[in-house]
A protein has these predicted regions:
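Signature for the C-terminal beta-barrel architecture of outer-membrane proteins
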Residues: 268-270, 279-478, 540-542, 550, ...
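Outer-membrane beta-barrel "beta-signal"
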Residues: 590, 626-640
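N-terminal periplasmic/intermembrane-space "pro-region" immediately following the signal or transit peptide
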Residues: 25-214, 220, 456, 460, ...
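Bacterial N-terminal signal peptides
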Residues: 10-20
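C-terminal structural cap/anchor segments
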Residues: 464-467, 471-583
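Membrane-embedded beta-strand positions of outer-membrane beta-barrel proteins
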Residues: 154-160, 217-221, 274-276, 310-312, ...
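Short loop/turn motifs that connect adjacent beta-strands in outer-membrane beta-barrel proteins
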Residues: 123-154, 165-169, 204-217, 262-272, ...
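Outer membrane beta-barrel
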Residues: 196, 200-321, 345, 451-501, ...
């Protein structure tokens, strides 16, 4: 090989070496991943590191008590954005357009009949009215007016009740059912059948998914038929010739109001609204002071993302039908007015607990209207005791109520307990008291509390109640507490004998120891049509209860309450005898609630309760000869 050829080969080798080096230099380096993920993604964590079991300050652990419900033990794997493919340009849209968000199911081919309560239905407020095919065909001008967001909601309820009970019942003074009935007390067995149909109709404007409605118009008529059978004449009607059976019916109006949304005060839809008409009002969490459906004007709203709620209102009592207890819109309203203001604060004084402050003024001016007799002929106002003169009164109530969890209670020893409590003082004046025969200053108090704790599927309840009583009816001071219109959810509520039944004070006037669906020993003629009475014996209640959700369809309820008067001087004066002992007795009750479809459409309730008399009740009713008073009921609720 010549020298020239060798030099050419050397130059070619050098050129190839430089080309390879240049190619190697142009290869991109491997990608490097940042130590910290982009903003918004979870940071890298050690999946094998156990989570801490100690809660952070103020943290609420979402864990049911007991075993078998442990929280996460390890952290889930972090999200890795490099394992998720991004969207590609020009990809077809997977969601087809629909007319509006209410018609999504119809756009996909689903059609539900109008009578189906379990799926989308125009009668349940699921769909706007204007686009209903029937309405657009037959009433197009109405459909046009209802654009774009008027809804209609219909609720129909059938409430059937059969009740068997035994109450103290007097022998009629004119004539008796059985010969030789010369005692004061007769046979007390009673049977009651009640059928109530309730139709609630509401027209609502607005998108209520995330904000309050702009307008709401609601009307709730109720139709009731009731039949009662007793063992003594004159127990059902004032005329003993009308016998021991009574059938009655009534059409009432339970709600009829207009609700107007006035304004939003924040971007979280805190609002102010006003409601005018016959409307439900509950003054506190448990209905101790006022739980009624009167005529009224209510201004209400929320603040601080629903952490603050308030109500300011004026209410006037509707006259009630005697035998049904429903509102009677066909008669004049009563001269009984209530001015109410309350304020709710969530997470006060600690997280998970809601506090409420309340002020109410009850003004009754029915003393100048003369005597009022109910539909059965018995006098209601004034009460048939003392000099039976009419009376007016003005009483103010100041109260505090609270309800919630005690998990964040200082000290931590109540972290599994719940508390519901109410405290009231009543201050006022009545111009005349029928028993004392003179004016009285009202100075009374009330307190109630219920502690509860959940043990998996069971809840234990401990209840205590105090109602001040009057020690001297003639000292110009009325110190027995009474409410405006109570309907308490407490100590078993309407499964308890003492709360459910009205026990008449026989031989002491046409009054009752306690009102039907009331816990206070108030000595009223009735809760629905009588006046408040602040000269009463007061009450102390101590109780224990248990709620057991055995299955989603089945709940068992049990209650055991001890009852005692605070002072029986008033009872001694009314009965013209030595004041009886203060012990009322033991109220024992049990109930079963069965929901076959695990919802409220079909609910069957049954309960049994008995009042085992104490020394005081035996002295009032001679209970040694007759055994305990009892109540057994069967109730079927059907809801559409």
């Amino acid at each position: 090989m010549s020298v020239r050829a060798s030099s050419r080969l050397g130059l070619l080798a050098v050129a190839m070496l430089f080309a390879a080096a240049g190619a190697r230099a142009q290869v991109p380096p491997p990608p490097t991943y940042p130590d910290k993920p982009p903003e918004g993604l979870k940071p890298n964590t050690n999946e094998d590191e156990p989570l801490s079991t100690e809660p952070k300050p103020g943290e609420v652990i979402q864990k049911r008590p007991g075993k078998g419900s442990e929280p996460l033990q390890f952290r889930p794997p972090p999200a890795n954005p490099y394992q998720l493919p991004g969207p590609t340009r020009g990809a077809p849209r997977e969601a087809p357009p629909v007319p509006d968000r209410w018609r999504i199911m119809q756009a996909l081919g689903f059609k539900f009949p109008v009578y189906d309560p379990y799926n989308q239905n125009v009668l349940k407020g699921d769909l706007p009215l204007w686009n209903d095919p029937w309405l657009k065909e037959h009433l197009p001008w109405v459909a046009e007016k209802l654009k774009p967001d008027w809804f209609f909601s219909l609720t129909a309820i059938s409430d059937s009740l059969v009740e068997l009970r035994r109450l103290p019942t007097p022998v009629a003074p004119q004539t008796s059912v059985r010969p030789n009935s010369v005692d004061i007390f007769g046979q007390g067995k009673q049977q009651v059948f009640v059928e109530t149909l309730i139709f609630e109709m509401a027209a609502i404007k607005g998108n209520t998914t995330f904000r309050p409605p702009d307008y709401e118009i609601r009307i709730t008529p109720a139709i009731q038929y009731n039949r009662a059978e007793v063992d003594e004449n004159r127990a059902l009607r004032i005329d003993p010739r009308q016998g021991t059976e009574r059938s009655d019916n009534h059409v009432g109006l339970q709600t009829a109001f207009v609700d107007v949304h006035l304004r939003n005060v924040s971007d979280r839809y805190d609002f102010d609204s006003i409601r005018v008409g016959i409307q439900p009002i509950t003054s506190d969490f448990r209905g101790f002071l006022l739980n009624d459906v009167p005529m009224g004007i209510r201004y209400f709203g929320i603040r601080d993302n629903n952490h603050v709620q308030f109500n300011v209102g004026w209410f006037r009592k509707m006259e009630k039908d005697t035998n049904s207890g429903l509102n009677d819109p066909w008669t004049k309203m009563r001269k009984d007015e209530t001015y109410l203001a309350n304020y709710y604060q969530q997470d006060f004084p600690f997280v998970g607990f809601t506090s409420q402050g309340l002020a109410a003024l009850n003004i009754n001016r029915e003393g100048t209207q003369g005597n009022y007799f109910n539909n059965n002929g018995f006098i209601e106002r004034p009460a048939a005791l003392g000099d039976e003169r009419g009376r007016n009164y003005t009483v103010g109530y100041l109260g505090y109520t609270g309800d919630g969890h005690l998990r964040n209670f200082p000290g931590g020893f109540l972290d599994r307990w719940n508390l519901s409590t109410s405290v009231y003082i009543a201050l006022g004046h009545e111009d005349h008291n029928s028993l004392a025969g003179q004016s009285q200053d009202i100075r009374a108090g009330f307190a109630a509390a219920e502690f509860s704790r959940d043990f998996s599927w069971m809840r234990l309840r401990l209840s205590a109640l105090y109602q001040s009583g009057d020690k001297d009816p003639y000292d110009h001071k009325a110190t027995g507490f009474d409410a405006i219109f109570e309907n308490p959810l407490f100590a078993g509520a309407d499964t308890s004998f003492w709360i459910r039944q009205s026990v008449p004070l026989i031989g002491g006037g046409g009054i009752a120891l306690s009102a039907r669906n009331g816990v206070l020993a108030s000595l009223r003629t009735s809760k629905e049509q009588g006046q408040s009475n602040f000269v009463n014996p007061g009450l102390m209640l101590l109780g224990v209860g248990l709620d057991a959700d055995v299955m989603p369809q089945l709940r068992l309820i049990g209650n055991f309450n001890y009852l005692r008067f605070q002072d029986t001087t008033v009872l001694g004066v009314l009965r013209n005898q030595k004041p009886p002992d203060r012990e009322i007795g033991w109220d024992v009750s049990g109930a079963v609630q069965y929901r076959p479809f695990m919802n409220q459409n079909v609910v069957f309730n049954t309960s049994a309760a008995a009042l085992y008399p104490g020394k005081g009740l035996k002295q009032l009713y001679d209970e040694d000869k007759r055994g305990p008073q009892y109540s057994i009921l069967f109730n079927l609720l059907l809801t559409y």
